[in-house]
Amino acid sequence: MNLNLTRPLLFFDIESTGLNIPNDSIIELSFVKVFPDGKEEVKTWKIKPWDYEKQCQRPIDPSASKVNGITDDMLVDCPTFYEVADEVADWLKDSDLAGFNSTKFDLPMLAEEFERVELAGKKLNVDLHSPK
């Protein structure tokens, strides 16, 4: 496949605690970044889902665990999205995004996580809504 890229193309996928975007959280985030020169970088984070109001780990819906194979116990020692948000934002910077079903679920879920982090006090400069 020949791609004529002028900016990096970032393919991404998430796994979550459930399908309710305002109430569920990302538990795994995977990126494959393809650069205009053809170089590729891959990154995956396992993320402890955090309830910012209750200040505790958010449980994974059992039906979500059946789909993604990730359990609460697997995430106990993982960082929260708050802790990886800066690194995630760096990966997104200056990239065009691509993914399966990304505009209906993955992108809104990612935007929700960034919004929670900003409400918790971390200042980020992430724009997932404006096409470049």
Q: Where would I find each of the regions flagged by the language model?
A:
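Conserved non-catalytic scaffold segment of RNase H-like nuclease domains
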Residues: M1-L128
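A contiguous binding-surface segment within folded domains or other stable secondary-structure elements
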Residues: K132
